[in-house]
Regions:
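Short beta-strand-to-turn element immediately C-terminal to the catalytic PLP-Schiff-base lysine
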Residues: 110-113, 247-251, 329-331
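Proline/glycine-rich low-complexity loops and linkers
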Residues: 124-157, 161, 251-324, 328-330
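N-terminal small/polar loop signature for handling phosphorylated ligands or for N-terminal nucleophile
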Residues: 42-106, 189-249
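Short glycine-rich phosphate-binding loop at a beta-alpha junction
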Residues: 41-47, 71, 172-174, 276-282, ...
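An N-terminal, well-structured beta->alpha segment
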Residues: 1-61, 65-67, 145-171
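Phosphate-binding and adjacent anionic-ligand microenvironments
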Residues: 273-451
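Gly/Ser/Thr-enriched, mixed-charge loops and adjacent short helices
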Residues: 106-231
């Protein structure tokens, strides 16, 4: 079985099974991980992908041969590995998942002690080198032990601490787990909540009979939106396969962009934690900054990407961090991202709103700071395009380069970023209460980018 480093990315390992991610790769990762991170005991779990158990067995074999004990938490979501690693005081955690990729993929995400992220510049490249070169030490004299652990009840109990359950209204909520790993979690939480949950594709199934669980894709949204409209639900939630991201739909079935969720969740935390810091990414910013400042919070900008966000949150002791890509991070969840905490906070904010619908709560913000949404353009020379745009717009605006190129004017601003993996430039534009200006500037920039 060939072992190549093609699947090693900036934040995880991900590739087609068995060509790029396979049992031999997993075994070698297991042999390497304890040496590189000093881990004596590691949590291991897998999502619903069909190759998950085989990769888990090979990974576990490698870990135990390296003398490392394994806590096998079984089928789970990525955040449950974060939780188990921190909650049980382990030396690391490995989640077998390819998140929202098609079913032929699998992969691994890694954390060290305290559920701190491992990315390319904090150890992932070292894993790749040791795996491909087979430079890990000889097997330990005493192999590690394997124990099975069920962390579901402790995890659910922790998740529910983020809201006052007694104050939640009995909403009807559509929950679409996309045949991913979130189904059993929803079932376990249901008995503690006053909601009527309308379940869609709730059975975990690695064949993905209803499509890839990736609600960011336009074609996957209608399944949730349709049921919201048909059942008269108060709102809808959809998750990706390993449920580290959740996506919200209002009572009309309209998709709520992740940007506005960052502001909404900032509000949830700052109402309870006066003066706290919150983290936001540079793509779209004005709504989040205004909400934070109005509530006496400290908004702090950070480059997008989970390793950057988590490090910045620790640095400034931020209570919450959000990215418009629907990743939401929580200080009391070991600074990790969760796809289960956000929808509960939305229900809590709605419950305290005096009967307002989700669309009513969101509309004011969306009208105040309308956005283009992220628009992708394929270009032959991304760097040249970035330089050209900066030369044209930079001199008359305020330029920042925390993440890509941001240029700000009185009434509008934009952010332009290059993709790390493809010849694509991503554009986000926002204005102050001016949809006509938004269209004008978005069209103008796209013409310039694609010229």
């Amino acid at each position: 079985m060939a072992v190549i480093d093609k699947g090693f990315g900036a934040y995880d390992v991900r590739g087609i099974y068995p060509d790029e991610v396979n049992e031999e790769l997993a075994y070698r990762v297991g042999r390497s991980f304890p040496t590189l991170f000093g881990a004596k005991k590691v949590a291991v779990g897998h999502d619903i992908r069909l190759s998950g158990p085989a990769i888990r067995d090979a990974l576990t074999k490698g870990l135990t041969e390296a003398g490392c004990d394994v806590v096998d938490i079984g089928q789970c979501g990525t955040e449950m590995i974060y939780f188990a690693t921190a909650h049980l005081g382990l030396g690391g955690g490995i989640m077998i998942t390819a998140s929202h990729n098609p079913k032929q993929y699998n992969g691994m995400k890694f954390v060290r002690a305290e559920a701190r992220p491992i990315s390319s510049d904090t150890g992932l490249k070292d894993i790749a080198a040791m795996v491909v070169g087979e430079t890990y030490p000889a097997p330990a004299a005493v192999p590690g032990k394997i124990e099975k652990a069920d962390v579901l009840d402790a995890y659910v109990k922790h998740i529910l601490t983020y809201v006052d359950v007694s104050r939640l209204k009995p909403y009807k909520i559509v929950v679409n787990t996309g045949n991913g790993a979130a189904g059993p979690i929803i079932n376990a939480m249901e008995k503690f909540l006053p909601f009527e949950l309308v379940k869609v594709y709730n059975e975990p199934d690695g064949n993905f009979p209803n499509g890839v669980p990736n609600p960011i894709l336009q074609e996957n949204r209608e399944a949730t939106a349709k049921v919201v409209r048909e059942t008269g639900a108060d709102f809808g939630v959809a998750w990706d396969g390993d449920f580290d991201r959740c996506f919200l739909f209002d009572e009309k079935g309209d998709f709520i962009e992740g940007y506005y969720m960052v502001g909404f969740l900032s509000e949830a935390f700052l109402k309870k934690n006066k003066g706290a810091s919150i983290i936001y990414d540079p793509r779209l910013i004005w709504n989040t900054i205004e909400i934070a400042e109005q509530l006496g919070g400290k908004p702090v900008m950070c480059k997008s990407g989970h390793a950057f966000i988590k490090d910045k949150m620790r640095e400034v002791n931020a209570i919450y961090g959000g990215e418009m890509s629907a990743h939401h991070y929580f200080r009391d969840f070991s600074y990790c991202d969760s796809g289960q905490i956000p929808w509960l906070l939305v229900a809590e904010l709605m419950s305290a709103s005096g009967g307002k619908t989700l669309s009513e709560l969101m509309k004011a913000r969306m009208d105040r700071f309308p956005t283009s949404g992220e628009v992708n353009s394929t270009v032959s020379d991304a760097k040249a395009v970035m330089d050209r745009i900066e030369a044209k717009y930079g001199p008359s605006g305020k330029v920042t380069k925390v993440d890509g190129l941001s240029v700000e004017f009185d009434k509008w601003r934009f952010n332009l970023r290059m993709s790390n993996t493809e010849p694509v430039i991503r554009l986000n534009v926002e204005t102050r209460q001016d949809k006509a200006l938004l269209k004008e500037k978005t069209d103008e920039l796209l013409a310039e980018i694609r010229a």
